[in-house]
Amino acid sequence: MNKQRVTLNCDMGESFGNWKMGSDELVMPWVDMANIACGFHASDPSVMSKTVALAKHYKVKIGAHPGYQDLVGFGRRSIPHTPAQISEIVLYQVGALKAVCQYHDVPLHYVKPHGALYNDMMESEAIFRAICEAVSIFGIPLMILATSDNQRYLDIADIYDVPLLFEAFADRQYQEDGKLTPRSQANAVYHQPEDIYNQALQIATYGSVNTANGTRLSLEADTICVHGDNPESITLVQRISQAIAKM
């Protein structure tokens, strides 16, 4: 069993102009960490500022959520970049959110890449190194996917003096190697509240998930990613938060 209570993190600040995404005001009181979009895959300066202020109000730790420059595709399309360009887009976005945090007199606690950039980071050592290099400038941890081989990533991040936070997903199906089932495949995302609730509690209590073929996979995760995109999911986040608080 996990010795330390896992935290809950959620993607936030993903509205853009007149386009509304998520229910940040209703979810924020129930999570520990807010992954705030930085303007490339979603968000804008006003949304970033409002979301930072909301996180400050509820004493939620703030993380930068950089992605590929792809508003139309919501950052879920992989866009070819050189390692140097990866470092530059991460520096640009994290630097912007850090400035917003300074304006609101709150610290920036960590970085968690978004969507396709997150997936590419987990698949490509060159991209992972490029992101570590950028994050090292800020002296804060990088959040990545907990897998069956956390040590591999720890060894690389240590070269850049970047601490790692490992996360697991409450609403995603896992493969035997600890990677997430691609969204292009059936059953990659869980939609039934009880399935999501049960997986979250299994991670929090036993540090494990059941994979696509039914085997149990151990995951050393510090935090669980949840989503609050609709009224039903907001209620679910509340249930998960209350259950973990009792552990």
Curated annotation (Swiss-Prot):
Name the reaction it catalyses.
Answer: 5-oxo-L-proline + ATP + 2 H2O = L-glutamate + ADP + phosphate + H(+)
Q: Where are the transmembrane segments?
A: none
Source organism per UniProt: Vibrio vulnificus (strain YJ016)
* Function, in words: Catalyzes the cleavage of 5-oxoproline to form L-glutamate coupled to the hydrolysis of ATP to ADP and inorganic phosphate.
Report the protein name in the record: 5-oxoprolinase subunit A
PANTHER family with a match to the protein in the record: 5-OXOPROLINASE SUBUNIT A, UNCHARACTERIZED PROTEIN YBGL-RELATED
Q: Check the record and name the SUPFAM superfamilies matching this protein.
A: Glycoside hydrolase/deacetylase
Question: Mind telling me which Gene3D superfamilies this protein's record contains?
Answer: Glycoside hydrolase/deacetylase (3.20.20.370)
Please report a single Pfam family linked to this protein.
LamB_YcsF
User: CDD domains, per this entry?
Assistant: LamB_YcsF_like
InterPro entries linked = Glyco_hydro/deAcase_b/a-brl, LamB/YcsF/PxpA-like
Q: Which family does it belong to?
A: Belongs to the LamB/PxpA family.
Which EC number(s) does the record attach to this protein? 3.5.2.9
GO MF: 5-oxoprolinase (ATP-hydrolyzing) activity; ATP binding
Query: What residue ranges carry the coiled-coil annotation?
Result: none
Q: Which UniProt keywords apply?
A: ATP-binding, Hydrolase, Nucleotide-binding
The protein's assembly and partners: Forms a complex composed of PxpA, PxpB and PxpC.
For this chain's UniProt record, which GO biological process terms are given? carbohydrate metabolic process
